[in-house]
Amino acid sequence: MNRGFFNMLGRRPFPAPTAMWRPRRRRQAAPMPARNGLASQIQQLTTAVSALVIGQATRPQPPRPRPPPRQKKQAPKQPPKPKKPKTQEKKKKQPAKPKPGKRQRMALKLEADRLFDVKNEDGDVIGHALAMEGKVMKPLHVKGTIDHPVLSKLKFTKSSAYDMEFAQLPVNMRSEAFTYTSEHPEGFYNWHHGAVQYSGGRFTIPRGVGGRGDSGRPIMDNSGRVVAIVLGGADEGTRTALSVVTWNSKGKTIKTTPEGTEEWSAAPLVTAMCLLGNVSFPCDRPPTCYTREPSRALDILEENVNHEAYDTLLNAILRCGSSGRSKRSVIDDFTLTSPYLGTCSYCHHTVPCFSPVKIEQVWDEADDNTIRIQTSAQFGYDQSGAASANKYRYMSLKQDHTVKEGTMDDIKISTSGPCRRLSYKGYFLLAKCPPGDSVTVSIVSSNSATSCTLARKIKPKFVGREKYDLPPVHGKKIPCTVYDRLKETTAGYITMHRPRPHAYTSYLEESSGKVYAKPPSGKNITYECKCGDYKTGTVSTRTEITGCTAIKQCVAYKSDQTKWVFNSPDLIRHDDHTAQGKLHLPFKLIPSTCMVPVAHAPNVIHGFKHISLQLDTDHLTLLTTRRLGANPEPTTEWIVGKTVRNFTVDRDGLEYIWGNHEPVRVYAQESAPGDPHGWPHEIVQHYYHRHPVYTILAVASATVAMMIGVTVAVLCACKARRECLTPYALAPNAVIPTSLALLCCVRSANAETFTETMSYLWSNSQPFFWVQLCIPLAAFIVLMRCCSCCLPFLVVAGAYLAKVDAYEHATTVPNVPQIPYKALVERAGYAPLNLEITVMSSEVLPSTNQEYITCKFTTVVPSPKIKCCGSLECQPAAHADYTCKVFGGVYPFMWGGAQCFCDSENSQMSEAYVELSADCASDHAQAIKVHTAAMKVGLRIVYGNTTSFLDVYVNGVTPGTSKDLKVIAGPISASFTPFDHKVVIHRGLVYNYDFPEYGAMKPGAFGDIQATSLTSKDLIASTDIRLLKPSAKNVHVPYTQASSGFEMWKNNSGRPLQETAPFGCKIAVNPLRAVDCSYGNIPISIDIPNAAFIRTSDAPLVSTVKCEVSECTYSADFGGMATLQYVSDREGQCPVHSHSSTATLQESTVHVLEKGAVTVHFSTASPQANFIVSLCGKKTTCNAECKPPADHIVSTPHKNDQEFQAAISKTSWSWLFALFGGASSLLIIGLMIFACSMMLTSTRR
């Protein structure tokens, strides 16, 4: 479906949009023909109801509400079962809903007779279908039937690529259909739930607006035209990004799917069943609730703690079947829990103590210096456990140890300074804190003050490439992760349990050698004693325990099993409730955007093959560079203050990134001082800067050659003089011109003629005579044989070519994105056809296999098991890195006193294991193995006046098609991939890293905790947990453990491939790929349709053409200008092409007259650009003497490579030839001969 759903409809003009204030249905009701059957009744009913309910607000009459009796009279006119709609309508009008806004009213009015419900077999609405532009369209993932007697019987065409299906709309319904538009500038649009914002190429809505069941709804502009159809949504924090179908200006359908999108079709309701003992019940309708039977309700939750519908059961247990708002406002999941006292390491920054605000854990994974704190107190609840926004509750340290409450103003949080509290819920606080070495939570009231300090280093954090202490007011927004301040979000679960009852010494009294159980007023307590025999009992008044003489022989406690507490190691696990519950961990770590500073842009000074960056910043800013060739040579440096950095730039280019600025790519031009067409010293100066080594070698060679030539000439002259004068030295007074004597000594030599040679062979070797004579005859015979064999082939080929539908053209295109390759297709009998192939994009797509994911782990230390006067035994457990150990001779002591009546026969079973961190979903790394890579390119092909875009795999096999065009590309000349065999992906960044294999964990190293996915149950780990013997002062579980290998890897991961990849590759993920790598050449075979060619008789015929270059600057841009003067037989379009790789023309086709001139622009990298240009097939040569460019550095890559024959100017060659064989050489030789003659003709006696 290359044209989407509207191939035929895109060419007709859109009908004029209907005005919003004039209801279209009422205006057209009179002239419409009467419809027969059920469809007509439904249409009339829909029109009437819409006019009464919605159109009332738009009528041009006084805004009086319609009397209720008239609405009731209209209701019975609905099809059978009138009572059911009545009750439904009454139910809808009972809640006091806010009045719909203007955008909602408009959407509702337009959707009234154009949008249809899609229902499943049970009659539930699961999505929508809409009538638009002569078609009825429905999302493919909405599996149901359109609630319309006619539309439900239509045959739909499916398109899985766009997740849509469509059918032709009946003719009598087309006038009521929507129209669509491809124009959607940034701003706000309308849909069923209000406003939709379009920005950055995405449609977004506030979170919580819209959801399942909204698939298929339209998004409309203010004119009522559809700009998009909603398919689903992806939660992105405070807003939801919509997955939509839109259309471009050519009518082609475009599907936009944000990452993490969920389809918004309403799933069929499946009743989940939960268990209580052997009895099953629907999870959303438990047999009891917490307010009625707290203990039994907790039993139900604990038994179904691992059920997939646990959240549904938890909500049902809390709601108790009540629909009143007062109930929902005070009942919360933390109503099931209670605060507790825990052992704090530093109370008031000094000594350990039992604290009501013991800090259990601190998370600091957010990028905005926000921390999440878990304590033993509860925030947002009053003393009774009801939700109260301005209160908190805590376990009192006083003798009664009851739950107390206070105002949230008493809660203070600090690190190295005060923190700002952002949100709170249950055991958790969310605060933004300055850096520090510890975290302190304090309760400061007028009566008392208590605090707890946890040693935890809070490091200053920043995102981006510039360090800052405080986020700027103005700057740039980049992706980051923050804690969601909404209390309703969940980051996972925390484990809860009902602890063993705490024994309080205050419940026992010793008097006169007797022990008494002394319960608080109106409370029951249970005592256990070992006074010879084991004794136990439950009393409500002061009672003597017979046989006991000391308090240490007994323990007494209150039994309350109606509350959960956090599974803290400071509490004792209950023997009867080993099952655990779980509650949601609030304040999820979510992706967001953070404001970061942007350093002052560098002052860039361009030089010859180098740039200087003058940098000035008042905070640490990162500067990274890499070369865009085969050897990237990446550099990284943090800079502060004023400084200058110099970098060499070559033809391949250099990329530098300064702070949070966008990457900048620069390329060196072959600019140089001097003039390649000037005097010798200017030529030497020019080439010395461009090619210093070769220039030095050439000048040195020329100098040496001249010195050798002069030296040899002088020596030869001396020797000739000596040799010639020697014979006359014996003849006294001889005067003879020596030059004449030398000339006489030279013998003449002439080659024999053909006749003399043949006569000699006939006389001396007749066989060779005949062989010599047969050579021309043999050549003639071979030539005739070849012609006789080729003639039938040429005849058959010519007949076959006349029948084919396409002409195949093969060429090789450089794999350099955005650089066009141009060719001229010359076909016998047809006019030349210009062909331009541009690699718009390229992707190296490796096949990958995810080995595992890893992230920061959380150590879970459950409440220990205590056995008084006995021993325990460890049992195996299905947890990652599970460690268990039993310690004997312990003396458990808590804030209520001793918990056992034995001194040393007690035992404690300590356990510990690890889990994925609650923030692992937002901060984890993928360990991936990379295998064979495939390559895909996006091509832009222009032939004649036709432009086509297509994607094709570069494997030499798989064809790519676009309309009548067929292309086969590859294989590429050189295989390349920037990825090693093992890579790690973390937050969109890719690292080549040799990670450990799955199952080969090492404590403190990358991969110390591994899972195949974030939701899998196959978690394995090795963190070297070692349990230690607890001390007697309090109940606790001491242990040691290796630090997180994931955190250590993050701090030493090095630079990602995005900054170090060769060939200028851009690395992307989801899927893993390398984009726009400039390397290699791609062979391409293209079948050009016959319709693209023009017969020679129909094309202009250029008889003469002449090229004159008016201006030429060799550079990366089109710096040359040439004028082609021509004579043609007719007016028309002519292809113009450069047949030399020395120059590339900017134009592909020009308009010619019968006689005239056209100007073309060309790009060359050579100072002497001599290239052949053809106009309508007529060729001529352009000779250009190009000047060096003024700009040393440019931002565009070169379009041509320099060739040897064009690298040296014609003037340089002239000077070089003149040096060795021109007039100067002749002059030197003449002078030498003259000198020799003078010496030889001189007389000596």
Curated annotation (Swiss-Prot):
Result of changing residue 163 to N: No loss of autocatalytic cleavage by capsid protein. Infectious virus is produced
Residue ranges of region Interaction with spike glycoprotein E2?
Answer: 157-162, 249-253
GO molecular function terms listed in the Swiss-Prot or TrEMBL record: RNA binding; serine-type endopeptidase activity; structural molecule activity; ubiquitin-like protein ligase binding
What is the protein's species of origin?
Answer: Sindbis virus (SINV)
Q: Which residues form a coiled coil?
A: 682-730, 1196-1245
Q: Which residues lie on this side of the membrane: Extracellular?
A: 329-690, 752-763, 807-1214
Instruction: Give me the disulphide-bonded residues.
Output: 283-289, 480-594, 529-554, 531-548, 724-745, 855-920, 868-900, 869-902, 874-884, 1065-1077, 1107-1182, 1112-1186, 1134-1176
Ranges for region Disordered: 1-106
Annotated phenotype, changing residue 724 to A? Loss of palmitoylation
Q: Which domain of life is it from?
A: Viruses
Q: What processes in GO biological process is this protein linked to?
A: clathrin-dependent endocytosis of virus by host cell; fusion of virus membrane with host endosome membrane; membrane fusion; proteolysis; symbiont-mediated suppression of host toll-like receptor signaling pathway; viral translational frameshifting; virion attachment to host cell
What is the activity regulation entry? The channel activity is blocked by 5-N, N-Hexamethylene amiloride.
Instruction: Quote the protein name from its UniProt record.
Output: Structural polyprotein
Q: What is the effect of changing residue 163 to H?
A: No loss of autocatalytic cleavage by capsid protein. No infectious virus is produced
Which intervals of the chain are annotated as region E1 fusion peptide loop?
890-907
According to UniProt, the reaction catalysed is: Autocatalytic release of the core protein from the N-terminus of the togavirus structural polyprotein by hydrolysis of a -Trp-|-Ser- bond
Gene3D superfamilies on file: 1.10.287.2230, 2.60.40.350, Alphavirus E2 glycoprotein, A domain, Alphavirus E2 glycoprotein, domain B, Alphavirus E2 glycoprotein, domain C, Tick-borne Encephalitis virus Glycoprotein, domain 1, Trypsin-like serine proteases
Family per similarity comment = Belongs to the alphavirus structural polyprotein family.
Q: Which residues does the annotation list for site: Involved in dimerization of the capsid protein?
A: 189, 222
Q: Which UniProt keywords apply?
A: Capsid protein, Clathrin-mediated endocytosis of virus by host, Cleavage on pair of basic residues, Coiled coil, Disulfide bond, Fusion of virus membrane with host endosomal membrane, Fusion of virus membrane with host membrane, Glycoprotein, Host cell membrane, Host cytoplasm, Host endoplasmic reticulum, Host Golgi apparatus, Host membrane, Host nucleus, Host-virus interaction, Hydrolase, Ion channel, Ion transport, Lipoprotein, Membrane, Palmitate, Protease, RNA-binding, Serine protease, T=4 icosahedral capsid protein, Transmembrane, Transmembrane helix, Transport, Viral attachment to host cell, Viral attachment to host entry receptor, Viral envelope protein, Viral ion channel, Viral penetration into host cytoplasm, Virion, Virus endocytosis by host, Virus entry into host cell
Comp. bias (Polar residues):
38-49
* The keyword Coiled coil is annotated on this UniProt entry: yes
What is this enzyme's class at the first EC digit?
hydrolase
| Residues annotated as site: Cleavage | 264-265, 328-329, 751-752, 806-807
Tell me its EC number(s), please.
Answer: 3.4.21.90
